[in-house]
Regions:
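Short glycine-enriched loops at secondary-structure junctions
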Residues: 126-127, 170, 231-236, 349-352
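Catalytic pocket-lining loop regions of alpha/beta-barrel enzymes
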Residues: 3-8, 161-162, 168, 178-337, ...
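Active-site loop-helix segments enriched in His/Asp/Glu that coordinate
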Residues: 115-117, 128-160, 173-185, 207-210
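Residue-level preference for long, well-ordered alpha-helices that form the structural scaffold
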Residues: 102, 136, 140-147, 172, ...
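Alpha-helical scaffold segments that form or flank carboxylate-/histidine-based iron centers
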Residues: 33-41, 138, 168-171, 175, ...
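Mid-to-C-terminal alpha-helical segments outside catalytic/metal-binding sites
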Residues: 2-37, 50-120, 149-157, 178-181, ...
Length: 391
């Protein structure tokens, strides 16, 4: 007797660009208990307004990055010179025309997410990340502060549906305190910390695990907000003539391991035990292998290490960390290794790799993997705990 094929997570045919998709949650039962609030732990939002030029003081307007709409995408950079080029701009054109993709139509955003079965979201930036390493550190901080004000306004307009991710000064302690204090006063609950920190004001590469950076971590720890890291900073090491966008997506998670190692082997978590860290959009299947490899590295190189980790490798994960995923059946099969309280479902709206348009299938897969009661935590409870919100 032949067995029937396993149901697929993906709709039949080509899924297509997000701007051409629509939600179908009302037509499908996920198996979640009635009344479950689905909270996507990782979505993205484009800035539609020319916020930096509008909000910079007159004497600095000539240094403000501009934002404009062109050929289906919101671009930014000096006037007419987009910093968003190549595959990055091509990808933006896949979704920026969605009614709710940008900050100028929060009502449409809430509606599109609801049609896809999503009640609430944590919204990360899109093209603004191209400004992460603006060469003028003072202008960079001003950019971040303007963005924080803007995303806080979006959060307010969403009436509890959208929680914005802020940006902070990570290169000096006073700036970290300044931006964290302001970010908290705006009602933001977390911030994005780049995995590649770039250079300090003197042009020296920043080492997150250095003694000099400890004062910045002190400020982050004192603020009490969780740290988020996101894929997307790793670039292919050599060009691809064919399907470069797919190759780039496959290496996106590369930098997680380096930062993960800094937290453990670099002593960051030993010196700052109050930190909480989330890893976003990289899935969860990477976690067991990273833990296993870290245990082997520690056993093999302990005699050479200047800093001796104070705890078992897995305790750092269990105490401080969690991760988000969209479609990760392999990771869900390893849930006992990872921890049911350490994983957070997301739709990643409105990206190409998002489940937007078929999120009900992904949610049902979570229920099938862990059961309805545990699924409630995975699809909403864990991200609310991470952010420290109860509503």
């Amino acid at each position: 007797m032949m067995s029937s094929p396993a149901p697929t997570l993906y709709p039949e045919g080509v899924i297509g660009a997000p701007k051409d998709r629509r939600g179908h949650a009302a037509e499908f039962s996920t198996g979640l208990p009635a009344g479950t609030e689905v909270f996507s732990a990782d979505n993205h939002i484009s800035v539609a307004d020319d916020i930096f030029y509008e909000r910079f003081p007159d004497e600095l307007k000539d240094q403000a990055p501009r934002i404009w709409y062109e050929d289906g995408a919101y671009l930014l950079g000096p006037p007419g010179q987009s910093m968003v080029v190549g595959d990055f701009s091509a990808v933006l054109m896949q979704y920026d025309d969605l009614a709710g993709a940008a900050t100028n139509n929060v009502e449409a955003r809430v509606r599109e997410l609801a049609e896809d079965g999503v009640d609430k979201e944590l919204a990360f930036p899109n093209a603004v990340l191209a400004l992460f390493h603006h060469p003028d550190h003072a202008i960079r901080e001003r950019i971040f502060r303007v963005y924080n004000e803007h995303i806080a306004e979006v959060q307010e307009r969403s009436s509890g549906h959208c929680y914005g991710v802020g940006l902070i000064n990570w290169w000096d302690p006073a700036g970290a305190r300044r931006t964290l204090t302001e970010l908290k006063s705006l009602g933001l609950t977390t911030f994005l910390m780049p995995i590649s920190p770039g250079n300090d004001r003197d042009g020296r590469p920043i080492d997150y695990s250095s003694a000099e950076m400890s004062a910045v971590w002190d400020e982050i720890e004192a603020a009490g907000l969780p740290v988020t890291h996101h894929i997307g900073e790793s670039q292919p090491k050599f060009p691809s003539e064919v399907n470069s966008v797919a190759v780039a997506m496959m290496v996106n998670i590369d930098s997680f391991r380096e930062m993960f190692s800094k937290y453990i082997f670099g002593g960051i978590l030993d010196r700052h035990p109050g930190l909480r860290v989330g890893w976003f959009e990289g899935g969860i299947a990477w976690v067991p292998t990273a833990l296993q490899d870290a245990e082997h590295v520690l056993a093999s190189y302990r005699h050479m290490l200047a800093h001796q980790p104070k705890r078992d490798v897995r305790d750092y994960w269990d105490t401080h960390m969690c991760a988000s995923f969209m479609v990760d059946p392999l990771g869900l099969r390893q849930i006992d290794e990872i921890g049911i309280d350490k994983v957070m479902w997301s739709s990643d709206y409105p990206h190409n790799e998002s489940t937007f348009g078929y999120s009900e299938r992904s949610l049902a897969a979570v229920v099938d993997a862990v059961g309805p009661e545990d699924a409630v935590r995975v699809v909403g409870g864990n991200i609310k705990k991470f952010l420290g919100i109860s509503a």
